[in-house]
């Protein structure tokens, strides 16, 4: 066999695409970075695939009533944070204990659309939970 045939050639090696054409915003960021490179106000770009977690939840604010209104008439009541959390939200502070598992399918609770929240099937790669966990409701297996 010819030695040059043994070498695998990259068919895309001759193609050159400028980065600014791939991401138009990148060119603008590079221009801004070059003009104010000595500025300490710049923040580093995020380095992960995920967006940062919010540090706090937005709280409802009281809406002032119309002018001349007495008392709290026309004002929206301020609700506490517990009222804003949905009962099935796995990220709420009122979630079930971490690692709570069952020997079989968990019992159906009030308000459960599905009889369980199982993330243990082999086709679900969304988490690494133990069998029959109640952490998520994203599994495609439904046991009725």
Swiss-Prot record:
Protein location: Cornified envelope
Any one of the GO BP annotations: biological process involved in interaction with symbiont
Tissue distribution: Expressed in the stratum granulosum, in skin and oral epithelia (at protein level).
Ranges annotated as biased composition (Polar residues): 78-98
Quaternary structure and partners: Interacts with LCE1B; the interaction is direct. Interacts with LCE2C; the interaction is direct. Interacts with LCE3A; the interaction is direct. Interacts with LCE3C; the interaction is direct. Interacts with LCE4A; the interaction is direct. Interacts with LCE5A; the interaction is direct. Interacts with LCE1C. Interacts with LCE1D. Interacts with LCE1E. Interacts with LCE2A. Interacts with LCE3D. Interacts with LCE3E. Interacts with LCE1A.
PANTHER family, sorted: CYSTEINE-RICH TAIL PROTEIN 1
Pfam families the record matches: DUF2477
Similarity section: Belongs to the CYSRT1 family.
Main localisation: other
GO molecular function: identical protein binding
Gene name for this UniProt entry: CYSRT1
Stretches for region Disordered: 51-105
Originating organism: Homo sapiens
GO cellular component annotations of the record: cornified envelope; extracellular exosome
Lineage: Eukaryota, Metazoa, Chordata, Craniata, Vertebrata
Function of the molecule: Component of the stratum corneum that may contribute to epidermal antimicrobial host defenses.
Stated name of the protein: Cysteine-rich tail protein 1
InterPro entries listed in its UniProt record: UPF0574
